[in-house]
């Protein structure tokens, strides 16, 4: 996949992505009915990977116009009809969506943006009860942040500076 040179763009490392999708396939062996969203799509690697593994629908949200154009070119090159690309602010876009819209949500904002907590707040109502939320951070995530959003880590790992977690909603 071609990558546009954008300041602050930090694609998920291949090793981390392989681990993540191994976890997802273990927890959700059949993705054929899954709907996914990547709130800070960047290169789109996570969303395109989810689509390639059979997800029914994947939405990529990105605010950077250069990246949106690149995502659109990649979608057409791959003939990935199950992918929707939305240009805009992820928090504003998701505010308009109905509850329980997604089985898989990717939240990987720029590390120092302060967007992780607001994104978790915005998506708490969007995830289905058995859904998965992936977060990627530059520092270990605080358990209090997860508890506030009624999430628990199903799997966690780190590779270098990248800390990554696959979260599930707590039962009501």
What are these regions (language model features)?
Residues 1-172:
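Class I S-adenosyl-L-methionine-dependent methyltransferase catalytic core
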């Amino acid at each position: 996949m071609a990558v546009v040179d954008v300041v602050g763009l930090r694609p998920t490392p291949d090793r981390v992505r392989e681990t993540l999708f191994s976890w997802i396939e273990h927890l959700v062996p059949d993705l054929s009915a899954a709907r996914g969203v990547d709130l800070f799509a960047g290169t789109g690697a996570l969303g395109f990977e989810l689509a390639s593994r059979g997800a029914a629908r994947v939405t990529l949200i990105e605010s950077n116009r250069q990246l949106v154009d690149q995502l659109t070119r990649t979608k057409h090159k791959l003939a990935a009809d199950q992918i929707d690309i939305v240009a805009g602010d992820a928090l504003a876009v998701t505010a308009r969506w109905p509850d329980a819209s997604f089985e898989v949500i990717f939240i990987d904002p720029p590390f120092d943006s302060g967007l992780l907590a607001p994104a978790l707040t915005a998506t708490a109502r969007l995830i289905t009860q058995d859904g998965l939320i992936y977060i990627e951070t530059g520092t270990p995530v605080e358990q209090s942040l997860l508890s506030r959003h009624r999430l628990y880590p199903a799997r966690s790992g780190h590779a270098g500076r990248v800390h990554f977690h696959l979260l599930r909603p707590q039962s009501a």
